[in-house]
Amino acid sequence: ACAAWCGTWTGLNTVTLEAPIEARVFVPPALNLFALGAFLAGLTTMVSAGTNYRARTIGIVGGFYAVSMVLKIVGRAAPGWEWLGYTSFFTPFEPQRLVGDASRAWSVWFETAPGSYELGGIGYDSVLIGLGLAAYVVAAVVFARRDLPAPL
């Protein structure tokens, strides 16, 4: 996430644009990317704690990733299937929504209409990091109770 933001900063400072853009507006999306990475690291650790084979871990996590992506795409594209998007872990990964609106980017909750609220940038990050930490806890419990095979 830091490398992505540094690349954005470098690009903005080496290219001439019609309207100047400050690199600091890209900090919330970079933090959202970090939170997604933290969740995926926790998920992968949790799956890895329960299996002996790297290929199986990669297959399970890759399949989960692909299914989650399909669920989010179908939830956005198919009328009447919007609810399906909420079953994906990509739901709190919305870096594009955090670029243009600083009040949304730096808040836990954001009022979209009177009486209607959505998660803000900090809320998105909290959900992803919280799920990642929960996965790490599950991984620790599973690994502590697991019978490891003897070395060959």
Where are these regions (language model features)?
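Secretory targeting signals
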Residues: A1-T45, A49-G50
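Hydrophobic, aromatic-rich alpha-helical transmembrane segments
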Residues: E22, F26-A30, F34, R54, ...
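A structural motif at transmembrane helix-loop-helix junctions in multipass membrane proteins
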Residues: F34-V70, V74
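Terminal transmembrane helical anchor/hairpin motif
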Residues: T57-V142, R146-A150
